[in-house]
Amino acid sequence: MQNVNIPVGICNNRIVFRSLGFALSENNLTIEVLSRPIESLGRVLLFLYLYPSFAADYAQRYYGATWNQAYDISVRSLAFLLPFLFSPAVEWAVGPVFKSFVPLTELLKWSLAVGYYPTFPGSRQQLPSVPYDVNYGVQSTKAATVKLLRRAMLDDCIQSKTRLEAMLERGPDTFRNVLKAHISRIDRFTSSSGWHVADDYHMDLVLDISSGISRPSVHDNISFIQRSMRRISDILYDLCVPAHFLDLWRFTGLQCFWIDPNLGKF
């Protein structure tokens, strides 16, 4: 697998991606919407998971993985993030557009904690079953999962449910249509590269599980969440990950680009 280096612009402790319309703050690891809204949900999520300072560096630091292995775990864990679009970690702006991720590191930890650890190519060894947190140390699977779940979601589950209901009131099947439109748009350019068009069954499943996870009562049943995440990952993996990862960079406009250093206005 080939490494991909992404030249970016740094200003005011932020990594700015003007072409994509957002910036990553190095201080609190949040996303800021800049001059124009984020046009592609999948583009932002995939970009975050491909960017070494976040996903790859996290896997390298805490698991001793190589960059290629870190890329592998990052992309394969992407499917687990989609049901959490309605969690307190995500704030919605007007319409189907992200405003911020708060905090990004917790989503990364949670996506690793739900139990999906792919085998690295050429090796039978898998990632450990418990993520190592420098603040808490290694813990049992149950204790670590509960702690991550509460830190990432439980503290604001009522607000999450309220946000979900408000979003659904703005229009029928908003989330399903957003994700379906994105995947279909990409598929037009990459029909021979491993992408699949999402149908109503796929989108209904995503929406149903997302709604279920957003209900406070469900948080008491961690095994339900784990089963739901594993179930949905089997479908979303084909929908969200191309057969050849370089196609992603070519067809979603994520080629290497330099940022104008004059970005103080953002």
Curated annotation (Swiss-Prot):
Q: Which Pfam families match?
A: Luteo_PO (PF04662)
Signal peptide (from-to)? none
The GO biological-process annotations, alphabetized, read as: symbiont-mediated suppression of host innate immune response; viral process
User: Which terms are listed as keywords in the entry?
Assistant: Host-virus interaction, Inhibition of host innate immune response by virus, Suppressor of RNA silencing, Viral immunoevasion
Species this protein is from: Poinsettia latent virus (isolate Euphorbia pulcherrima/Germany/Siepen/2005) (PnLV)
What does this protein do, in the record's words?
Suppressor of RNA-mediated gene silencing, also known as post-transcriptional gene silencing (PTGS), a mechanism of plant viral defense that limits the accumulation of viral RNAs.
Q: What is this protein called?
A: Putative suppressor of silencing
Q: Does this UniProt record's set of keywords contain Manganese?
A: no
Q: Does the keyword Lyase apply?
A: no
User: What InterPro entries does this protein map onto?
Assistant: Virus_P0 (IPR006755)
